[in-house]
Regions:
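RNA substrate-binding interface of SAM-dependent RNA methyltransferases
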Residues: 1-91
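Short, solvent-exposed loop/helix junctions and linker helices
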Residues: 17-20, 101, 137
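Structured adenosyl-cofactor binding patch, chiefly the S-adenosyl-L-methionine
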Residues: 31-33, 46-60, 117-154
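Glycine-rich loops and low-complexity Gly/Arg-rich segments
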Residues: 36-39, 62-66, 89-92, 109-112, ...
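Active-site/ligand-binding-proximal alpha/beta "capping" segment
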Residues: 85-135
Length: 154
């Protein structure tokens, strides 16, 4: 994992993402937003599955991919010189108020469970995306895209 981080910028770390459509959409959005790459933590779906490749519209071949266990990612966060921004429903900070300057890792959790307590503990900032309507959360790929484009404002 350390070898991938020779370039600064924004990395996206995905913890236990299961849906290949979500992963492909995140890959496509990360490519469009010029993210430095994607870190797949623990048991993520295969980025080279037919559905993920299709959803990525081929962006899977343009984005640097790294695989890490939760333990490896945790060890990496201890020496990482940048921010780790995680999204979590219980967070009190609005994503628009976060410090999105590089270098940073955007840490996104599993579709059903979100970020584990362990992963939240690795974050230098925890943010939420406010829900104005009746829905209590957004699709993982949509939430990731919103955060990536907020990062582009910096």
């Amino acid at each position: 994992i350390n070898a991938c981080f020779s370039s600064a910028g924004c990395w996206v770390a995905l913890d236990r993402v299961r849906d290949p459509g979500n992963l492909g959409t995140i890959l496509r959005t990360a490519d469009a937003a010029a993210a430095a790459g994607i870190i797949l933590i623990d048991d993520c779906t295969d980025p080279y599955s037919v559905e993920a490749v299709r959803a990525s519209m081929g962006a899977v071949f343009n984005v640097c991919l790294a695989q890490a266990t939760a333990s490896e990612f945790s060890n990496f966060c201890q020496i990482w010189q940048g921010s780790v921004i995680g999204t979590a429903l219980p967070a009190s900070n609005d994503y628009r108020q976060a410090d999105w300057s590089s270098p940073l890792v955007l840490l996104m959790g599993n579709e059903q469970a979100g970020l584990s307590e362990e992963m939240m503990g690795l974050c230098t900032q925890l943010v939420r995306l406010p829900m104005k309507g009746r829905s209590d959360s957004l699709n993982l790929a949509v939430a990731t895209g919103i955060c990536l484009y907020e990062m582009l404002k910096v």
